[in-house]
Amino acid sequence: MSATRSRLVTRIAALALSLAAAGSALSATASPAEAASGPARSSRHDAGPTCRGQGVDPDALVRYRSEVLVDAPLSAVFRTQTDVEQWPSWQAGVLTSERLDSGPLRAGSSFRWTTPVPATPSTPATTLEITSTVHQLQRNHCVRWTGPADGDGIHIDEGTHVWTFTEVRGGVLVRTEETWTGEQAEADVPTSTEALGAGLEIWLKDLKAAAESRATC
């Protein structure tokens, strides 16, 4: 393994371990909806969430899908998730988030956000910067965005992220799926998938807590 690839794997492993540790309590408290998660099957016929007919990258090797039931009004859940500039106020894994345009979030909107990557014995701590562009959005129903991520020693060519929101008995079922592509992300698919999955589980947990808290205010 080259030195560059070794450093990358170390970086991704550190991110995976950090996120997994932060979300370790999830499995003990997961509802049936929350339990339906894991690396998504690569089959084109295994239908995941879509927004206006578009889903994640069907050819991506790194992918993860999950869902959570949120006991809050649909509008509150959708608003919490799509008010991207407020992410740092309720997402433990988001340091900063800024819109690169103005007005309501819509197809064509872009935003830049950052998440920490912890230090390892061989690499210093860094910050992963993600620039996302919304391609599809349907109010109170779904949103899909894509974009690259860059940090010291780590790069994801493109992440594709889809969210759907459906009213069901007991609240709103939030489903999400994300894929990563690029040589670096694919250098160690299991570890990259672990990092992606741990991050999405924490995101869902934080979204549930934030939306339910705001609904009771």
Can you name each region flagged by the protein language model?
Residues 99-153, 205, 210-217:
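Glycine-rich portal/gate segments that line the openings of hydrophobic small-molecule binding cavities
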Residues 70, 74, 80, 127-128, ...:
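Solvent-exposed, acidic/flexible segments
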Residues 2-5, 30-101:
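Hydrophobic ligand-binding cavity/cleft-lining segments
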Residues 1-35:
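Secretory targeting and sorting signals
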Residues 61, 108, 140-142, 169-173:
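A generic structural signal for beta-strand entry/edge sites
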Residues 76-81, 87, 111, 134, ...:
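Hydrophobic pocket/interface hotspot
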Residues 146-198, 202, 207:
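Beta-strand/loop substructures that line and gate deep hydrophobic ligand-binding cavities in soluble
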Residues 63-65, 125-132, 156-162:
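Short, surface-exposed coil-to-beta transition loops
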